[in-house]
Each structure stands twice: as structure tokens, then as C-alpha cells.
Curated annotation (Swiss-Prot):
Gene that encodes the chain: rpsI
Organism per entry: Synechococcus sp. (strain CC9605)
Claim: Cytoplasm is one of the keywords in the record: no
Biased composition (Basic and acidic residues): 95-113
Biased composition (Basic residues): 114-133
The protein, known as: Small ribosomal subunit protein uS9
Region (Disordered): 94-133
């Protein structure tokens, strides 16, 4: 990567994962925490598709490299965070990209997270066995 090339940044979050995504002009390679993207995501096709989805929505999958620093959570949360971060970086690239990404749902934060455990219960909603007598 040359020093004068343009870099677009985006931050994504999902569950407890946070991803800092950089879009750099290139040939479509994905690097996550210094490792190849498919290797990092255990060659899982749904995770890889989620990461590539924003670029494929705009037809730019072979024009930009994705460089990611991600931490927290598991692979599901991390791939979702990378997807949102890449979409935000694409919005920084051009304001015209926002509408198609928004209609596909790549820009919205998924609010689903682990529910906290309550006292008196075994798990978030599982109650101890009820005995009538």
C-alpha cells in the first residue's frame, strides 16, 4: 500500500464485537487481524458472504481491499460488525452509496444482544423447577 493512496474508515458493532474497517483501493482481498479473511472466519460461507455483502451490493467487490481490526465476541458478532463497518466506509467513499446500502440493511445496528441473568432465576428466563407440594 503506497503512502498517497486514499483510505476510507468505518466502525461497526454487533453483540459485543467492535470492528475498525479500512477500505483501500485494491483487488478485493480481505485481511482480518493480520490473517486472510476466509481463514479467520473458518471458511464459513455465511460469515464470508456477510463480510462481502456491502461491496457486492454496490458491485465494488474486486475494486477495494478490506483491512480489519476486530475484537470481542465470536465469529457471528465479528462478521456482523465487519459488515456494518464496511458499509459505513463505503458511505464515506461516496454519499450516493448510502441509499442502496440502507435499503439492503447493511447500515443498521442489530440491537439483539445477550439478555442479562436475573436473580431468583437460573438463566435469563429459565426459572427453577416448580413444585406444587
Amino acid at each position: 500500500m503506497s503512502n498517497n493512496s486514499v483510505v476510507y474508515w468505518g466502525t461497526g458493532r454487533r453483540k459485543t464485537s467492535v470492528a475498525r474497517v479500512r477500505l483501500v483501493p485494491g483487488n478485493g482481498t480481505i485481511t482480518i487481524n493480520g490473517r486472510p479473511g476466509d481463514n479467520y472466519l473458518n471458511y464459513n460461507p455465511s460469515y464470508i458472504a456477510a463480510v462481502k455483502a456491502p461491496l457486492e451490493t454496490l458491485g465494488l467487490s474486486s475494486e477495494y481491499d478490506i483491512l480489519v481490526n476486530v475484537h470481542g465476541g465470536g465469529l457471528t458478532g465479528q462478521s456482523g460488525a465487519i459488515k456494518q463497518g464496511a458499509a459505513r466506509a463505503l458511505c464515506e467513499l461516496s454519499a450516493d452509496n448510502r441509499k442502496p446500502l440502507k435499503t439492503e440493511g447493511h447500515l443498521s445496528r442489530d440491537p439483539r444482544a445477550k439478555e442479562r441473568r436475573k436473580y431468583g432465576l437460573k438463566k435469563a428466563r429459565k426459572a427453577p423447577q416448580f413444585s406444587k407440594r
